[in-house]
Curated annotation (Swiss-Prot):
InterPro entries: Mur-like_cat_sf (IPR036565), Mur_ligase_C (IPR004101), Mur_ligase_C_dom_sf (IPR036615), Mur_ligase_cen (IPR013221), MurD (IPR005762). One of its GO terms (cellular component) is cytoplasm. Cell wall formation. Catalyzes the addition of glutamate to the nucleotide precursor UDP-N-acetylmuramoyl-L-alanine (UMA). One of its GO terms (molecular function) is ATP binding. ATP binds at G124, S125, D126, G127, K128, T129, T130. This is UDP-N-acetylmuramoylalanine--D-glutamate ligase. One of its GO terms (biological process) is cell division. Pfam families: Mur_ligase_C, Mur_ligase_M. NCBIfam families: murD.
Length: 458
């Protein structure tokens, strides 16, 4: 049951509130809390100089700042603590606050708790952003006022009083955001679950349990959309409290949405042809099937078809950059796991020269080698994981006698030059790293933008 936001306004007014992390989502949150009458202290590991103008702006607003080395040691004596999504609830600082009686929450939890509009929550190891965007496009096409947030779009909590009951709200939710989520989400979509973020989660089970929170607090009238091809998600119906619908790109029996003979179907009705979908690849067929099921009660088949035939995709997802000397370059920087890279490779009709590597999330790379070799003409590695990926391809050669040429470089510029030097007329070069970007770049967008800049300067 959605609660009246006036309750929150009364609760937060005059409270001594800590906000951990001065990032994209927390900057508007801090300003909003000040507006609601809270006494706010903002915490961040960066210095005032590193934060730039925002630190001065906060000082003018009366926000106390606790910055730099040891900043979490000073997180004590607060009535309310808004944590950053990646901060574990069992961290020493938060355990200390909880023992002191603090209410610990996050921007996303409070938003979902008080949001009047119907909430669609999208999670999964791969396909979250594209599926979230498709759901938003479908609802907008049908004429609904649609708000998009979570991991993408703009932070929504500060806009909560503008969102009406008839509005639709589509959220991309990460495992970090879901770990402490204990509120009802009207429509939950789980695209797939494969090993991911094992550098942050204690183990795979904790990661799975976090994902389950997207539907754990649903009631009988709510909806759960699951991937019937994924070994983990196909069994989630056993724990569901609401209605469950399934999608599959490989089988039709018992499926609520499926792909057959080049066409996509939802609840037995043909929606569109695969060849008419602008964004290519079977992973995008699955993203559409999931989205169609999520909005089936609100969106017409005509609107579904229109979006599929006009939506050109999201930046950094199998994004065509340019063709140089007969070689096509694609940016798939979003691919931060081996499974997402495999899905991207399947979108191409011929083997590609793959640029891969980056930050180590402690996931195995054998699937990339053993399942992807037919789609890889050569692989050029960079980043912290390059030796780990190289070892997976070496194992493939030793065990199966399958040789994939492996090259490596130190920088993105160097690997692009290596790929360019081995490419022939008609080849495809794609950046699809199978890893996060944090060893060399702030995020996958910065990595993708740098790649595009390099390619556009060839």
């Amino acid at each position: 049951m959605k609660r009246d936001f006036n309750e929150f306004k009364e609760f937060i007014k005059g409270k001594n509130v800590a906000v951990v992390g001065i990032g994209v989502s927390n900057i508007p949150l801090i300003k909003f809390l000040v507006k609601l009458g809270a006494k706010v202290t903002a915490f961040d590991m960066k210095s005032a100089e590193e934060l730039g103008g925002i630190s001065k702006e906060f000082e003018i607003l009366g926000v106390n700042l606790e910055l730099g080395k040891g900043y979490l040691d000073r997180l004590t004596g607060f009535e309310v603590v808004f944590k950053t999504p990646s901060m574990r609830i069992d961290s020493e600082a938060l355990v200390r606050c909880k023992n002191q009686g603090a209410y610990i929450t996050s921007e996303m939890e409070e938003f979902v708790r008080y949001c009047k509009g119907k909430v669609y929550g999208v999670t999964g190891s791969d396909g979250k952003t594209t599926t979230t965007t498709i759901v938003s496009k479908l609802l907008s096409q049908e004429g609904y006022k649609t708000w998009t947030g979570g991991n993408i779009g703009t932070p929504l909590f500060s806009n909560i009083e503008e969102i009406k009951e008839e509005d639709k709200v589509v959220l991309e939710l990460s495992s970090f955001q879901l770990m402490t989520m204990d509120v009802e989400i009207d429509v939950a979509i789980v695209t797939n679950i494969t090993p991911n973020h094992l550098d942050m989660h204690k183990d795979m089970q904790e990661y799975i349990d976090a994902k389950k929170n997207v539907f754990k607090y649903q009631r009988e009238n709510d909806l759960l959309v699951i991937n019937d091809e994924n070994e983990i998600t196909k069994n989630l119906d056993k724990e569901a409290k609401g209605k469950v619908v399934r999608f599959s790109s490989k089988k039709t029996a018992g499926e609520d949405a499926y792909y057959k003979d080049g066409k996509l179907y939802v609840h037995g009705k043909e929606v569109c042809k695969k060849d008419d979908i602008i964004i290519k690849g079977m992973h995008n067929v699955e993203n559409y099937l999931a989205a169609f099921l999520a909005v089936y009660d609100e969106v017409s088949i005509e609107s579904m078809k229109k979006v599929a035939e006009t939506f050109g995709g999201v930046h950094h997802r199998c994004e065509f950059i340019r063709e140089v000397d007969g070689v096509k370059y694609y940016n798939d920087s979003i691919a931060s796991t081996p499974t997402r890279t495999l899905a991207g490779l399947k979108a191409f009709e011929k083997p590609v020269i793959l640029l891969a590597g980056g930050y180590d999330k402690h996931v195995p790379f054998e699937p990339l080698a053993y399942e992807g070799y037919e789609k890889i003409k050569a692989i050029v590695l960079f980043g912290v994981t390059k030796e780990k990926i190289k070892a997976a391809f070496k194992r493939l050669e030793e065990e199966k006698g399958i040789h994939v040429p492996v090259y490596s470089g130190e920088s993105l510029e160097e690997v692009v030059n290596i790929a360019k030097s081995i490419a022939e007329n008609g080849d495809i070069i794609t950046l699809s790293p199978a890893c996060a970007s944090f060893d060399m770049f702030k995020n996958f967008e910065v990595r993708g933008d740098k790649f595009k800049e390099i390619v556009n300067n060839i």
